[in-house]
């Protein structure tokens, strides 16, 4: 079994949300692969599932690492300040770096 498949980061966002942009920038800085899910076109049922999955939170971003709800942008940056984010991201797939000269 491929262990990389077990590791996932999902971030629920809105395109124009500055907190979403900031959270994605931190994840990009960490060079980890994440799945971004845009919530603006969610059906009512999808919205309800999102809110339930997010522990009642209706705001974005909402970030999940290995199916564990981390929280929003502030929570992500708090983990970084506390030195705990890198530990949570251990084993996450890294983004492929472009070849030299590409």
Swiss-Prot record:
Encoding gene per record: grxC1
UniProt protein name: Glutaredoxin 1
One record GO biological process: cell redox homeostasis
NCBIfam families in alphabetical order: GRX_bact
PROSITE patterns linked to this entry: GLUTAREDOXIN_1, GLUTAREDOXIN_2
Keyword entries, A-Z: Cytoplasm, Disulfide bond, Electron transport, Redox-active center, Transport
Domain called Glutaredoxin: residue spans: 1-96
Compartment(s) of residence: Cytoplasm
Pfam annotation, one family: Glutaredoxin
PANTHER family documented for this protein: GLUTAREDOXIN 2, GLUTAREDOXIN-1-RELATED
Domain of life: Bacteria
SS bond list: 17-20
GO terms of molecular function: glutathione disulfide oxidoreductase activity
Subunit structure: Monomer.
Similarity section: Belongs to the glutaredoxin family.
Keyword set includes Membrane: no
């Amino acid at each position: 079994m491929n262990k990389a498949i077990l590791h996932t980061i999902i971030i629920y966002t809105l395109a124009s949300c500055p907190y979403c942009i900031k959270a994605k920038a931190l994840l990009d800085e960490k060079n980890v692969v994440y799945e971004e899910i845009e919530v603006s076109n969610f059906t009512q049922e999808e919205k309800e599932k999102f809110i339930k999955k997010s522990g009642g939170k209706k705001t974005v971003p909402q970030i999940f690492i290995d199916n564990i709800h981390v929280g929003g942008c502030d929570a992500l940056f708090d983990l970084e300040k506390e030195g705990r984010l890198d530990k949570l991201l251990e084993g996450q797939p890294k983004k492929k770096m472009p070849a030299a000269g590409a």
